[in-house]
From Swiss-Prot:
This is Aromatic amino acid aminotransferase. The gene is pat. It comes from Streptomyces coelicolor (strain ATCC BAA-471 / A3(2) / M145). The lineage of its organism: Bacteria, Bacillati, Actinomycetota, Actinomycetes, Kitasatosporales. Belongs to the class-II pyridoxal-phosphate-dependent aminotransferase family. Residues 1-21 are annotated as: Disordered. One of its GO terms (biological process) is L-histidine biosynthetic process.
Length: 359
């Protein structure tokens, strides 16, 4: 047998492995998972019934065009069907965007630290990542990002709110930034946590999409809508971009169950608003308690908070796990903590209080 291995693309060497939030241990003391920014509530009313009914058609392929879901989204956002595209979560759509715009020799700009998938999906395409450090306040440095644009730039991600810091870019600064971006460079406003925003100065990205053909908005059903396990997200973009997304989509990638669950979730708006409101209240309670303990906590507009711990990051994460909650450490930088059930948040706050005393 030959010992020669099949030749693989050189661009794949050195790609970092995506690290999902660690699950709660099934056989240990850990009871709460605060590591993946999931919604702690069960599916919205009507979703389980819809999913159960859709399960009867497992033997059939899903509607590849997501016809009913696209119609629902078109009505919800007031956009043409031709300006919509769906995918396996917003990260799946983000990867399609890079495939459609960027290849070897091209550049993709994004803030860092930001969403962990950006460097992975960029390198898969063969493009080069241009990482622009956050400001000392953990916010996108849009001036520096604009300065980083070259004739090789093809796409720019603006994660708003930013994952994992929860910080936001406000309307005036985003407008100034967009004015500096060449019209042939695609700007992707990644708004996975849009529903949790309460700052009136943070714009809805759809406003900018309506005015600028080079703006694309990403949304997901994984966070506020609580469908993380079903993998469905979507993009709103002008027709050339949306059409390219449909071309690069994995055939039948969004299951029929995911499509039906997304539609049912959209129709449960009142319950969604109530649940998100409760999580926003918990977010404020957790952040206020942390600041009272002496922590520096960036103002979060997402469903998580960020603590910059540097070299103490892993020790803090281990302390949380031993107490019964799992958080998401970024070694050498900090931890992201999902706002979960009040009981879980209380456990986390006890750990943070004790840990703070040791610093």
């Amino acid at each position: 047998m030959s010992e020669t291995s099949p030749k693989l693309r050189a661009e794949l060497e050195g790609i970092p492995t995506y690290k999902p939030g660690k699950p709660a241990a099934a056989d240990g003391p850990v009871a709460y998972k605060l590591s993946s920014n999931e919604n702690p509530y069960p599916p919205l009313p009507g979703v389980m019934e819809t999913v159960t009914a859709a399960a009867a058609s497992f033997n059939r392929y899903p509607d590849m065009a997501c016809t009913s879901l696209m119609a629902e989204l078109s009505d919800r956002f007031g956009v043409p069907l031709a300006h919509l595209a769906t995918g396996t979560g917003s990260v799946g759509v983000a990867q399609q965007l890079i495939q459609a715009t960027s290849g070897p020799g091209d550049e993709v700009i994004y803030a860092w630290r930001s969403f962990e998938a950006y460097p992975i999906i960029t390198q898969i395409s063969g493009a080069r990542s241009v990482q622009v450090p956050l400001t000392p306040g953990e916010v996108h440095d849009l001036d520096a990002m604009a300065d980083a644009i070259t004739d090789r730039t093809r796409l720019i991600f603006v994660c708003n709110p930013n994952n994992p810091t929860g910080t936001v870019v406000r309307r005036a600064e985003l407008e100034r930034f967009l004015d500096r971006v060449p019209s042939d460079v695609l700007v992707v406003l990644d708004e996975a946590y849009r529903e949790f925003i309460r700052d009136a100065e943070v714009p809805d990205g759809v406003e900018f999409y309506r005015e600028r053909p080079n703006v694309c908005v990403l949304r997901t059903f994984s966070k506020a809508y609580g469908l993380a396990g079903l993998r469905v997200g979507f993009a709103i973009a002008h027709e050339p971009v949306a059409a390219a997304l449909r071309k690069t989509a994995v055939p039948f990638g969004v299951s029929q169950i995911a499509q039906e669950a997304a539609i049912a979730s959209l129709r449960a708006e009142d319950e969604l608003i109530g649940r998100v409101g409760s999580l926003v209240c918990e977010r404020a309670r957790v952040a206020d308690a942390l600041r009272a303990q002496g922590w520096t906590v960036p103002e979060s507009q997402a469903n998580f908070v960020w603590l910059r711990l540097g070299e103490r990051t892993l020790a803090f994460a281990n302390a949380c796990e031993q107490a019964g909650v799992v958080v998401r450490p970024f070694a050498g930088e900090g931890v992201r903590v999902t706002v979960g059930e009040s009981e879980a948040n209380d456990i986390f706050l006890k750990v943070s209080e004790e840990f703070r005393k040791e610093l």
